[in-house]
Amino acid sequence: MKLLTASVTPFLPDHSIDFLSFENLLRFQERESHGVVLLGSTGESLSMTAKEKESLVSYACSLNLKVPIIVGVPGTSLHEASEWIHTCQSYPIYGFLITTPIYTKPGVHGQTLWFESLLNKANKPAILYNIPSRSGTTLYLDTVRSLAAHPFFYGLKDSGGSIKHCQEYAQMSSDFVLYCGDDGLWPQMYECGARGLISVLSNIWPKEAREWVEDPHHQYRADLWREVSSWLNQTTNPIAIKALLAYKQVIAHNTLRLPLSIQDLQCAESIPEIIKKMAQWKYSCAHV
């Protein structure tokens, strides 16, 4: 799985799940053979109840997609995370994305035991997620080293923004797949040893994302993708990507759940310009 899409969760204006838009989004990804990651930070999982999350996973699995489904496992409660993994075992998903514990800032021993416990329960391939900007701590190198040989440690998603740290992960073991978790850093992280991308921008540009992953050295595309990624990162994810998806009518509404708000998108007036810029992608074969 070289490319996975970190899927948004579409909501209706009353903040309930918009299942029609959700199916449209997943079919959009299926056409380009992308795996999907549900209920990560892009999917606003922390704002959803356990019942809502299960309904989303159940609905996605009922679509019989021809691409793998990976489900996010966030939180700080080991019991709740374990129960969520147990719930998901009832569905034909491919595996899990297990986030570094948020807010509690454990040391290396606590973090290692946390991941080991959840990997033992997973019984499916799992991707460990380094996201220090949200969790408050990095995914420690010693934790990765200790767990590298675990049979369910399939991959590592690195959204830490440090090329040096990415290199250290890549040099540690060939037993797991290293995924870039930042659209704009794909070329640099590929050079460091990343072999896959978990993308936010592929929600709206799945074909372009596939071409981007297959040819990270195309300078014109790299510059264009980096510019759009920079625009996206002006505000907290998934505010901007939802605005783009709604503008392009991939989803019906740009609704977010508090504490996220579409009013925090200060660059909304530039959405048509961003769409126009990405329309140049199809001419990129003339720019090498």
Swiss-Prot record:
Primary subcellular site in the record, as a coarse category: cytoplasm
A GO-annotated cellular component: cytosol
Pathway info: Amino-acid biosynthesis; L-lysine biosynthesis via DAP pathway; (S)-tetrahydrodipicolinate from L-aspartate: step 3/4
InterPro entries listed in its UniProt record: Aldolase_TIM, DapA, DapA-like, Schiff_base-form_aldolases_AS, Schiff_base-form_aldolases_CS
Keyword Transcription regulation: no
Keyword Mitochondrion: no
EC class: lyase
Gene3D superfamilies: Aldolase class I (3.20.20.70)
PROSITE patterns recorded: DHDPS_1 (PS00665), DHDPS_2 (PS00666)
Entry GO MF terms: 4-hydroxy-tetrahydrodipicolinate synthase activity
Name of the protein: 4-hydroxy-tetrahydrodipicolinate synthase
The organism of origin for this protein: Chlamydia abortus (strain DSM 27085 / S26/3)
